[in-house]
Amino acid sequence: MAAMMASITSELLFFLPFILLALLTFYTTTVAKCHGGHWWRGGTTPAKRKRMNLPPGAAGWPLVGETFGYLRAHPATSVGRFMEQHIARYGKIYRSSLFGERTVVSADAGLNRYILQNEGRLFECSYPRSIGGILGKWSMLVLVGDPHREMRAISLNFLSSVRLRAVLLPEVERHTLLVLRAWPPSSTFSAQHQAKKFTFNLMAKNIMSMDPGEEETERLRREYITFMKGVVSAPLNLPGTPYWKALKSRAAILGVIERKMEERVEKLSKEDASVEQDDLLGWALKQSNLSKEQILDLLLSLLFAGHETSSMALALAIFFLEGCPKAVQELREEHLGIARRQRLRGECKLSWEDYKEMVFTQCVINETLRLGNVVRFLHRKVIKDVHYKGYDIPSGWKILPVLAAVHLDSSLYEDPQRFNPWRWKSSGSSGGLAQSSSFMPYGGGTRLCAGSELAKLEMAVFLHHLVLNFRWELAEPDQAFVFPFVDFPKGLPIRVHRIAQDDEQE
C-alpha cells in the first residue's frame, strides 16, 4: 500500500508544475474577467448577495482554490479524505473553488437526480475546454442542446435492442473467446491490460470493422494509449508534454478514421452490396447528414467512451470477485446452469435468452459499478439561478454531482465499502427502492450513457466464459486508486488456472 501511494505521489509531484501553469493560464484568461472582485459571489449585485444563502464552504488558496485536495489520490472504494472532511464539516452540499471556477459540490442523491433531470433547463454539461480540444468539438461528451441530441440519437439507433440481440451479442462473445483462449494455463499477466485489449478490439471492430491482431489495428491501439495519457493530463500544448503527444496521436487516429471513411464512401458509390460492413462508420454515412468533421469526432469519442469505462469496470469485477469466493461460486453455478441448457438445446453460443437468465451476474455488475465508481463525478454548469433545500446556487457557477459519494453513502447502502452483490437480489428488500433511485453509474436524464446496455452485455458475457474456464488470484497486491480517474497502479496482475472441462460439467 505504501509503495503504491509513494508511486502515485511521485507522479502527482511530476505533473504539479504543469497543473499549476495550466491553472494560472486559466485564471488570467477567465477568472480575472469576473468584475468587481466579487467572483466568489458570482458577480451579483450587493443587494442580491445579501439575499443569497450559498451552501457553506471555503474558497481555499488563491488561484488554485481547493483543486489539489480534491484531486488527491485515494482508493477507488472511498470518496477520499477531502470529501469525507468537507461532508463532515459542511454537509452533503457545499461550495468550493475547483479547477479555477466557483463550484458547488453535491454528495446529495436528491440534488444529483435533480441536476440530471433538469439538463438543458437549469443545468448544462460543462467540461473543461481541454477535453473538447482533445476529443473534438463534436464529441458527445462536450456537446449540448440539439447537436448533442442528434449525435446521441445516432448512437442509440446503432446500439438498439435489436442490434444488441442480433449483431452485438455474437460479436461480444467472439471477442471474449479470442482473448481468453490466448491465455496460457497457469500464466500471470495484467488483467487490466487484457480487459483493455478486449474492449478496444470490440469497439474497433464495431466502429470501423477493424479486425483484432492486424497491424493497422495494433498501430491504432498504440496511438490510442498515447492519446489517453493526454486526456487526463494538464492541457499544455508544449513539445514533449503528454497533452502535446496526445494531440499528435489524435491526428494519427483521425487519419486512420478518415482513410476508412474515404474507402467506405468509394465502396458505397459503387453500390457493391458484397462489401457492405455493418459498423458505426457505415451507419453514420448512410443514416445521417453529418459532416465529415462530425463523423470523425463521433467515432473518436465513441472509441474513447466505449473502451475506457468498460475495460475498467471489467478489471474491477475481476478484482472484487477475487476477494469474494462465495460470489464466484454462485456466479459459476449460474453459468454452469446456462451452459447445461445450451448443451440440451444442441447449441454452443449464447442466446439472448441465456443473457436474460444471468440474474446474479447483473447483481455482480451493479455492485462492481457501485463500489468501484468508474465515473466518479460529472461536470455541469448552472444556467439559471437554482434554489434547493434552502440553498441558492447562482447561475454561472459550476456544479459537480459526485456519483461516487452517493454510491458509498452509508444512509443508502448498508456497509457501503463492502463488496456485497446480494444487496441487489431483491428490489423489494429493505432499502431496495432507495438503492435503485440513487444508483446512477451511467449518469441519467437526457445524457444517460448511450452505451450502458452494451457495457453490461460485455461484462456479463466476459464473466460467463471467465468463471466457466478459469480460477484466478492476485499475483501480487494491487488496488484501484483514483488519480483523478480510476486505475490500478500495477495493472492488476493475476495468476490464472484453467478449469478442466470435466470439472466444468460436474
UniProtKB/Swiss-Prot annotation:
Superkingdom classification of source: Eukaryota
Enzymatic reactions: a C28-steroid + reduced [NADPH--hemoprotein reductase] + O2 = a (22S)-22-hydroxy C28-steroid + oxidized [NADPH--hemoprotein reductase] + H2O + H(+); campesterol + reduced [NADPH--hemoprotein reductase] + O2 = (22S)-22-hydroxycampesterol + oxidized [NADPH--hemoprotein reductase] + H2O + H(+); campestanol + reduced [NADPH--hemoprotein reductase] + O2 = 6-deoxycathasterone + oxidized [NADPH--hemoprotein reductase] + H2O + H(+)
UniProt-annotated binding residues for heme: C449
InterPro entries per UniProt: Cyt_P450, Cyt_P450_E_grp-I, Cyt_P450_sf
Obligatory cofactor(s): heme
Pfam families: p450
Observed effect of gene inactivation: Slight dwarf phenotype and erect leaves. Impaired response to auxin leading to reduced epidermal cells length of the lamina joint.
Reported tissue expression: Highly expressed in roots and leaf blades. Expressed in shoot apex, stems, leaf sheaths, inflorescences and flowers.
UniProt KW Oxidoreductase keyword: yes
Cellular component terms (Gene Ontology): endoplasmic reticulum; membrane
Keywords: Brassinosteroid biosynthesis, Heme, Iron, Lipid biosynthesis, Lipid metabolism, Membrane, Metal-binding, Monooxygenase, Oxidoreductase, Steroid biosynthesis, Transmembrane, Transmembrane helix
Practical applications according to UniProt: Null mutant plants for CYP90B1/DWARF4 produce increased biomass and grain yield at high density planting.
Pathway: Plant hormone biosynthesis; brassinosteroid biosynthesis
TM ranges: 12-32
Subcellular location(s) per record: Membrane
Catalytic activity, EC: 1.14.14.178
Topology term for the membrane: Single-pass membrane protein
Alphabetized GO MF terms: fatty acid 2-hydroxylase activity; heme binding; iron ion binding; monooxygenase activity; steroid 22S-hydroxylase activity
GO biological process, one term: unidimensional cell growth
Induction (record text): Down-regulated by brassinolide (BL).
Similarity comment text for this entry: Belongs to the cytochrome P450 family.
Role noted for this protein: Catalyzes the C22-alpha-hydroxylation step in brassinosteroid biosynthesis, which is the rate-limiting step in this biosynthetic pathway. Catalyzes the conversion of campesterol (CR) to (22S)-22-hydroxycampesterol (22-OHCR, 22-hydroxyCR) and of campestanol (CN) to 6-deoxycathasterone (6-deoxoCT). Required for auxin responses involved in the regulation of epidermal cells length of the lamina joint.
UniProt protein name: Steroid (22S)-hydroxylase
